[in-house]
Amino acid sequence: MSRDVKEFLYAWLGKNKYGNPTYDTKSETRSGRQRFKCELRITGFGYTAFGNSTNKKDAATNAAQDFCQYLVREGKMQQSDIPTLTSSSLEASSTWQDSETATMFCGGEDGNSFQESQQPIPQKRFPWSNNAYQRNEGTHEQYITQKAEEIAASETVDLKSEIHGGWTMENSKKALNEFLQKMRLPQVNYGTKIRESNTVKTMETTAQIFVPQINKNLVGKGTGSNKKVSEAACAMNIVRQMFHLNIMQSYSGPIKKSKVSTLPEIAISIPEDLSTRVTEYVRSCGLELPEINETSATPEAPTSLLTDVKLAQFPVSEICSASNISWAPPLQNWNPWRASNIDEEPLAFMSMEQISQRIMEKEDFKRGEALDKITAQRGELPVAQYRENIVQTVAENRVTLIKGETGCGKSTQVAQFLLESFLENSNGASFNAVVSQPRRISAISLAERVANERGEEVGETCGYNVRFDSATPRPYGSIMFCTVGVLLRMMENGLRGISHVIIDEIHERDVDTDFVLIVLREMISTYRDLRVVLMSATIDTDLFTNFFSSIPDVGPTPVITMHGRTFPVQSFYLEDILHNLQHMPEEPDQKKRKKGGPPPPDDDEGDEEVDDKGRNMNILTDPSINESLKTAMSRISEKDIPFGVIEAILNDIASRGVDGAVLVFLPGWAEIMTLCNRLLEHQEFGQANKYEILPLHSQLTSQEQRKVFNHYPGKRKIIVSTNIAETSITIDDVVYVIDSCKAKERMYTSNNNMVHFATVWASKTNVIQRRGRAGRVRAGYAFHLCSKMRFEALDDHGTAEMLRIPLHQIALTIKLLRLGSVGEFLGKALQPPPYDMVVESEAVLQAMGALDRNLELTSLGKMLARMPIEPVIAKVLILGTALGAGSVMCDVASAMSFPTPFVPREKHHSRLSGTQRKFAGNKFSDHVAIVSVIQGYREAVQMGASAAEREFCERYSLSNPVLKMTDGARRQLIDVLRNQCSFPEDILFDISVNVNGPDRELNLMRSLLVMALYPNVAYYVGKRKVLTIEQSSALINKYSMLVPMNNRQEMDFPSPLLVFTEKVRTRCISCKQMSVISAIQLLVFGSRKVECVGEGLVRIDETITIRMNVSTAAALIGLRPCIEALLVKSCENPESLAGLNPSDAELRQLLRDISSEEFMSEAGPIKDSLLTDNALIQKGPAPNRLEYADWGPSNNNSSFQNQDFPPAAGGKVHPYRGNRRGNHPYAQNRPYAPPNSGMGYQNFNNSGYGASGDWNAGRGNYGNVGSGYRGAGGGGGYRGGRGGRGGGRGGGGRGWNASNW
C-alpha cells in the first residue's frame, strides 16, 4: 500500500493543480540505531509533513500519510478518500518496541527526547515597522558578513565595538546628547538604581528616548560599578541600536588609545626540523607564505603576517523563508514523545476510535477503593470547584490564563481535568498534553504525584523528560511533564500529536520560557485547534493577556483566578527576629579592621563601601525602635548573608520542640555549602541522629534532589535551597521558612567580555512565593532576613533573563527551528532585547562559521545548536573530536558548565590544599586539574561501589554532587556527538592523562582552550596580579591552582602567558579557571592581529612581543586555514574521520608538536606601576615554589621534582619544567630580561652548558652555567637577583642561585 498512499497524494496534487511533492530523506542514529527521517514539502503549502522508519521507503510513506492528514484538517480532503493504512503498507517493524502492552498502555521505554533529532516552521516581519527606515533586502546580511570579516582581520582587540560602528562607552553619551540637541528633543533622563549584592555594588541605569525617524521609543539599559559607568553603558546601548537602525552613522571621531604597558619580550626558538615540517605542510595545502622584509618593519609601521586565504568554506544555503513550528493533533500511527511513526502491529494500524476504547477499558480496570480515596482527596483541593470552568474555557479558547494562588492544586490537577474530559467523551486518544516546568525537580515530582493520584506508575498515563533522565508515557491519552528546555528541543520535530501545551510558572521569565511564548503565539495564530494554557500564582495578567490578545482572530485571553488552600503563615522581618530572639550579632569585620589593621590584601570577594547609610536599610530604621535593636540591626550588612542569625533562628526552633521541617532559601551553591558545613560542625545541628541537612540546587542529580521529599523519623529535616523550591513542588512537612530574600543572577557585559554573577535582592513576587512554602499543609512561620523597609523597596517582578544574557545560543535555536530572522523573531518577545545585542550575536556566530553569509545555519551551526553548552566551547569540542582529543575536550567542556568541585577542607580556608593541588601535577592549569579530577572520579565510579566514589571525594575534599552532574553532562556531550552529530564512535574513546609528565593530549587541550576563550588571555606580573590583553589589571582567583599557598610566595610559571575561562567582577576583577600557555599557542590559536615589528620580532595584538624567526611565525599562522578546512570537512562529513588521510594525520601531529610545553618561555621582569619592587625581588629567604604539605613524589616521567629547588638566598629561581634538558635542540641561548632590569637570566645551549653572555643585567656583566643540573646532563642556570659578578656549577641534581654576582 506504500505505493498507493504516495500515488494517491501525487494524483490528488495533479488534479488540483498543485506542485509536485518533494521528499527529503536523511539517515539519523538514535541510541546506536539507524532510522530514516523524511520531510515532505509541497509548493503552495506552509506545512512540512514528517515521517520516519527503519527504511527510506516506509519513512516516505509515513510522510505522505502525514500530509494527507494535514489536508483533511484543512478541509481540502475527506478522511474517507485516503487509502487505509494496513500492515502491508509498511515493510519494517519498529525498533522502538511500540507493542500493544508496552507502549500503548504502559508507555514507551525510557529514553530522552532531548536527544532526538527534530524539525521546521512559518513567520512574519520585524516590529520596528517603519519601512522607510528598514534596511533594504539583503543589506542586513551583507552588513553582518562585512563585520564578521573585519573581526577576522581586526585592527583592535576591542572586537565588539567594530560590530557596532565603533560606538563605545567613551564616545556614545556625547554623541547621543548632540543628536537630541540637533533633533530638538529633550535630553536623556537616566534612571539609576542600585542592584544590591553581597559581593559587588552594581548600578543599573535605564533610559528611554523617542526617535521620530521610526516613530517609536528606544529603551537602553546599562550596568556598571558606579553611576558614571552605568550611564555611559546605557547611552552606548541606545546609540548602538540607532546605528543598526540606520539612524546614526558609524563613529568617525578620534579613537582614544589606552596606554599600553611595555611587556618584556618572550623569546622562542623553534627547531629547524619542526619549522621545516610546518612550512612544507602549509605549502602542500596550497598556501603561499608571504615574503617578509624584516628590516623595514617597525613598531610604528608593522607588516601583517595574517592571511585571508580560505582553503575550505561551508556551503552557502539559500535564504530560508520564515515558517512556523509544525503541529498536528494526536494522529494514527504517531508517537509524539518519540517524534516517531509507530510501525509495529497492532497499534500502528488501530484507528483513533479503537485506541480510545482500549484506553477506557484500562481506566475501568483501575477503579477501586484506594483510587476512590485519592479522588476524594483531590476533590477537596480549591481548584476542584473550578473544574468545569477550566475545561469549558480551554475548549472554547486558543489561550487560557490561570492565576491560582499557592496551594490551590493547579500544577497537579489542570492537566488531569482536561484528560478526564476527553476520557468521559470516549475520545481519550485525541488528548496528549505537554506540561512545562522551570526545573527538573518540579517536572519529576509532579509526574510522580499525578501518576500516584491516577493509581499508576510513572510511564503509563504520566511521564517526564528532563536533562539526563526521562520516563516516556504511552503515545495516546497521556501527560508529559518536562523542562522548558526539553520542550524547545521537541519543537525541532514540530509538536505533532500534542493537543494541549501547558506552561506553568510563566512569571519566572527565564529566556527559554520567553522564547516558547513567542513560538506559541505564532502557532496559535496558524493552528486553530491547538490549545495553550498559561499558569502562575503570581503573574502580571495585563502583560500576558495583551501579548496574546493582539493576535488577529484570537480574541481576548480569558483569565481564571483561583484562591488557594494555604494555612496561615506568620511572617517576621529582620527587626522582628532580632527583637524576639534578643540576638546581638557580632561586630562586623569592617569595624574590627578599623581597630586592628587593614583588610587582607588578597580579599577579592567583598565589596568596599557597601555599608554607607544611603544604601543600608538596616541602618535606616524607625525612630521609635530602641537603641539596642538599632545597634543589632546596624551590625548586619545588607551585602552579607547573616549566617549567625540563621543559626539563632534554628536554635530557637530546636528549643521549642515543635516538629516540622525547615526550608532555608539562599542565593547560590557557595552559600548553600557554607551553611551546610556550618550546621554539620554545629554542636546541636551536627548530631546526625537528630537532624538531616539536605542541600537543594538545580544542578544536583535527580536522586539527590528527591531526598528532600523523604521523611526521616525522629529527625528534623533542614533543607538549604536556592529558589528551586520556590514554586511547583510541595515538601509536605515544611513548617518553617528562613528566607535570605536574595537571588543569584548571571549578567554579561559584551563590550568588555565581563561576566558578573550578582547576588541581588529577590522581587516581592519571589518573597511571597517563598513565604507560601511554609503554609502548604499546616500553619507555618516565615523569617525574612531583610527589614520591612527593604521589603517595601523590592521590585514587584524580576528582570527578564533575555535582557541580560548573550543571545548566541538562542539565535542558533531560532535558526535551527527555521523561525526566520533572529531580530524579527525576538522583536515579538514580551520584552524584546536591544537590537544591538541581536546584531552582535549574528556577527559573532558568523565569524565562528556557524552562520553563512545569508545568516543561515552551516553544518557546524546545526551541530552547535544541538549542544547544551556555549557555542564557542562547542566549536572547539567538535574540532577537538576531529583532532582525536574528543574525550578530553568533553571532560573540560562539561566541567566548565558547573561550579568547581573543590571544597575547602575547613571553612576558614581561602585557598586550595596541597592534596587538591595534586590534580594539576606540574601543569600549572586549573583546566588540567579538573580533567584529572573527572578521570579520577570516573575510575572510582567504575569500581561499582558507591563507597569508592565517596571515599575519593572525601579524601580530596571534592563535591560528589558536582562531579555527578559533570559526569552526566560529559556522557550527554558524547551522546550528542555520536547520535546527533554522527561522529564515529571509535574516535570518542577515553584518554588517560598524565599530569606529572609529558602529555600531548593535555597540551592540545590547552591550545583549543585558547581558541575558545580568546581574548581571555593575561600576562602574569607577580603574586596574583595579571594584565589582561586589553591592558587592564586583574587578579587570579583565590581558588586557582596558580595561586601560591600563602601571600609570601611568588609563583614561578614556565611562561608568563595565561588563558582563563571568564572575568568576574566582585570587589575587583578576578580571572577564573586559568592555565599557563606558551606564546606559540597564543600565536597560532588565539591572536587576532600578528605583525612583524622588526628583525626577529613578532607582535601579537599590539601587546605581546615575541622574539623568534619571522618566517617560522608566518608558517605557523598559515596553519589556521588548514585547521579551519579540517573543521569544515569534519562537519560536512563526520564519517570521514573514521579513516584519516595522511594530510589530516600530519596536521594532528603538527598541532600536538607545536603545543608542547617545550615552547614555554619565561619573559623578563615588568617595570610597570602595577608591580612593585617587592613583588619583583623578594627580600631575604624565599620559599619553595609551592609548599605542598602532602604532595608526595613526582611522576617518574618528569625531570622536575619540588625538592630540586632549595630556598633561595635572594632573587628568584625560574627553573624550566618538564623534559627541558641542556642537550635538547629546543634549548637555545636566549636572554629573558632587558638591560638594567635588576634580574639575571638563564642560558642554554645544545651541549648542555650555558654560554657566556656579555650583556648588562643591572651591574652584572656575565654568568657561566655548569653541567650536572638535576643530573640531567646540563641545562641549568643561575639567576642574579641584583647584578654583580658570580658563577658556579650545578651540583649532583641540584641547582642554586646567586644573589650577589
From Swiss-Prot:
EC number: 3.6.4.13
Annotated ranges, domain DRBM: 4-73, 171-244
Residues involved in Mn(2+) binding: 505
Single biological process term from Gene Ontology: regulation of translation
Span list, region RGG: 1172-1301
Chain positions covered by the region annotation HA2: 840-931
Compositionally biased region (Basic residues): 1214-1223
Major localization listed first in the record, in broad terms: nucleus
Region span, OB-fold: 971-1089
Biased composition (Gly residues): 1275-1295
GO cellular component, as recorded: centrosome; cytoplasm; nucleolus; nucleoplasm; ribonucleoprotein complex
Keywords: Activator, ATP-binding, Cell cycle, Cell division, Cytoplasm, Cytoskeleton, Developmental protein, DNA replication, DNA-binding, Helicase, Hydrolase, Manganese, Metal-binding, Mitosis, mRNA processing, mRNA splicing, mRNA transport, Nucleotide-binding, Nucleus, Repeat, RNA-binding, RNA-mediated gene silencing, Transcription, Transcription regulation, Transcription termination, Translation regulation, Transport
Region Core helicase: start-end pairs: 391-818
Chain intervals with Acidic residues compositional bias: 601-611
Keyword set includes Zinc-finger: no
Summary of the tissues where the protein is detected: Expressed in the pachytene region of the gonad and in the oocytes.
Keyword Cytoplasm recorded: yes
Locations listed in the record: Nucleus; Nucleus, Nucleoplasm; Nucleus, Nucleolus; Cytoplasm
Region (MTAD): 326-373
Reactions accelerated catalytically: ATP + H2O = ADP + phosphate + H(+)
Function: Multifunctional ATP-dependent nucleic acid helicase that unwinds DNA and RNA in a 3' to 5' direction and that plays important roles in many processes, such as DNA replication, transcriptional activation, post-transcriptional RNA regulation, mRNA translation and RNA-mediated gene silencing. Requires a 3'-single-stranded tail as entry site for acid nuclei unwinding activities as well as the binding and hydrolyzing of any of the four ribo- or deoxyribo-nucleotide triphosphates (NTPs). Binds to DNA, RNA and small interfering siRNA.
Subunit relationships: Component of the coding region determinant (CRD)-mediated complex. Identified in mRNP granule complexes containing untranslated mRNAs. Associates with the RISC complex. Associates with the SMN complex. Associates with polysomes.
Record protein name field: ATP-dependent RNA helicase A
